């Protein structure tokens, strides 16, 4: 007999609505158990979905998705949503090649109303949907679910300001898993919130306001008392000042209370914000104790059959973490900045050793970059540790605030290139293209860990903005040396061959060496995208017939394009054959990195096919 007696009956939200409300608590427990069992096989984002279980059940119980729009922010918390919307049996394939995505994806399900992976987008998207439906005469409801971390992003505030200003009918649910209210106040707050969210209070409050508006002094007094009274029990919030009807905080794990509150708010028109308190990792003791560790789990995390051992080779993030700690010990001007990526960027040790020189600015990439600019203006040396995919979000600041003023800011760009299982939303496919066109920048592409370490050093000492990009995961195990023959804008000949020259940008150097063995080709580690080693390009063009460029970045506008531009400017394009190999002009699905590289023709077999046609 199945242990999922209720869950087995549910494949869609329509099935969920047939379940008696009294059984929703049991269903929530079954969903958690199913999530544990499934991710023990597949791995995936874990703690966030555990924390949002009751909220997800209540949303699909009250609202009529997909007619009603439920928009999720970031997407880490949507595994329960996927289970309840026809993908229960596919959850074991999550983030695998040919399997379902780890994030909401419009092409995957009609219930995934808006594709996501980055944060702070939900309210903007939901507002657009609400207005579009209203303009087309559709009577749907629209809900945005956003976490207390994501709501710190500036885009979320912009959307709140817009929605409140135009009084659009939209519900924003703030999923707060940081427990910002102390326990002794929390009980009173929950009690008071039940009164505030009650239908009777709603009715009296709105009708009373209409009457009291005719007596301005009394109206202002009552309004002030209500605001001050709520302020005694809830965090000082500005949501009502933005035009939102604020309700909460309420217990995000009380599914009965959630259903009751959502039903009331569904009938309340205008912009509304429901503040729910949840616990990340709820229902799994280890995840509750260490939600960061259990944010994402590997297969067998629960059964323990395959214990994951620590990688024998350090990751590129580890190399950065070591470098910044060592450099900070020598230079008191160094400050480290990250937009909510302390663990991923390996800044934990730095934050512990130098807490007054470490700044986690939360999910605020634009602020992170301009903040670094302000630090640089006053003589400090800021290092911005940021993922490639998130650097995109601060593009104007990179240009206007840093490059235009030629400020000393070092960008340590992690997760450059393909990231694998997280897919297109997290791939670092474009940074070479969008950074290369900006004046005053130095752009470095290390081929191994040792180059990465010394390029960070070179970029730090450079007078102006500099960027070092490196991939996710471990390198080749290169030893970190005390010194390296590394000169600004100078490439390195790795292997001398003839006829064919392979210009490598970044960590595809092993691929270049494999091709060189097969074709007796010259291999050059270009190291710098900007400035290019033009002397090396001149030499190569004079001594070789075919030139290949390799990069784990989009071909359009990337390092290969820079080489093409140089050869065209020198009138050499008709004298040599140049072929660029990089990421194709399309978004890739999730999968293993080797598979995605092969799909991008970045493998010996595919490049050999092209070369054989040219020889």
From Swiss-Prot:
Keywords: Isoprene biosynthesis, Magnesium, Metal-binding, Thiamine biosynthesis, Thiamine pyrophosphate, Transferase. Binds 1 Mg(2+) ion per subunit. Binds 1 thiamine pyrophosphate per subunit. Mg(2+) binds at residues 148, 177. One of its GO terms (cellular component) is cytosol. The keyword Magnesium applies. One of its GO terms (molecular function) is magnesium ion binding. The keyword Transferase applies. Pathway: Metabolic intermediate biosynthesis; 1-deoxy-D-xylulose 5-phosphate biosynthesis; 1-deoxy-D-xylulose 5-phosphate from D-glyceraldehyde 3-phosphate and pyruvate: step 1/1. Signal peptide: none annotated. It is an enzyme of class 2 (transferase). GO terms for biological process: 1-deoxy-D-xylulose 5-phosphate biosynthetic process; isopentenyl diphosphate biosynthetic process, methylerythritol 4-phosphate pathway; terpenoid biosynthetic process; thiamine biosynthetic process. It catalyses: D-glyceraldehyde 3-phosphate + pyruvate + H(+) = 1-deoxy-D-xylulose 5-phosphate + CO2. Its cofactor is Mg(2+); thiamine diphosphate. Pfam families: DXP_synthase_N, Transket_pyr, Transketolase_C. Thiamine diphosphate binds at residues 76, 117-119, 149-150, 177, 284, 365. Its EC number is 2.2.1.7. Catalyzes the acyloin condensation reaction between C atoms 2 and 3 of pyruvate and glyceraldehyde 3-phosphate to yield 1-deoxy-D-xylulose-5-phosphate (DXP). Homodimer. Belongs to the transketolase family. DXPS subfamily. This is 1-deoxy-D-xylulose-5-phosphate synthase. The gene is dxs.
